[in-house]
Amino acid sequence: MKFNSISPNKQHHTGFTTSNNENLNQQLNQVLILLQTLQSQAKKIASFQNQTYEWNLKHHQNLKNVLKSFNRLNSIIDSKGSNNELNEKDNNEFENGVTFHQKIINTYDPLDPFSEELENLIMQIDRGLFHQLRDDSLEIIYPFILKWLKENNSLVLSLVLIWESSTKFHYLLNKKKFKEINKKILDCIVDYENKGIISTLINQNEFPFSDDEYNNLKKFLNDYS
C-alpha cells in the first residue's frame, strides 16, 4: 500500500521535469539563435566601419594631392589674369609641343583601354592639362571615371572631371554611350552617399563642392543619363 501510494506522485514528478527540460532547451535554442544573429550583425557593422576607415586612410593623401592640383570649385577660372596663367601653363607643359590630348591618343590601346600606363598618365591631369583635351581624348578618359568610382578610388578627381566635362564637353556627354556611363556614375555616387563617404569628406573639408554645386553636378548626371 505504501509503494502504491507514492508511485503516482513519482510518475507525475517525472513528467513535470521532462516538460521543463524541453521548454528550457527551446528557450536556450532561441537565445542561441538570437546571439548568433546579433554576432553576425555586429561583424557586418565592424566590417563596414573598417572598410570605411581603410578607404579614408588609403585615399587621404591622394585626395589632398588632387585638391592641390585642381583647387576647389569656387576658384574656377573666371578672370583674364587667371586665363593668362592657364595659357602660359598650356604652352610650357610639353617642351616638345605634344599636347596632353595627343599624349592620351598616343598612349591609348584599344585592345587594353584601361592600361596601367594610360591610367597613370590620366592621374597626372590638372586644370591646364584638362583644357588641352579634345573630344577624342575625353572619350578615352571618361570611362576611367566610372572605373575609379566602382573601385572606390579617386573620388574627388572623378567628380571634378565630371564637373569640368559638363562645362566644356556637355554636347559630347549627351551621346548614348556617355548617358549609359552617367547613369552608372550617378548610382555609384548615391552609393557613396549611403555609405557616409561624401559626408565624411565634407566634414574633413576635403570635398571641393558647395551644396549647390554638388546638387547641380548630380542634376547634370541625371539629365544626361
Swiss-Prot record:
Compositionally biased region (Polar residues) = 1-19
Return the annotated region ranges for Disordered.
1-21
Origin, by domain of life?
A: Eukaryota
| Name of the protein in question | Putative uncharacterized protein DDB_G0268712
Q: Provide the taxonomic classification.
A: Eukaryota, Amoebozoa, Evosea, Eumycetozoa, Dictyostelia
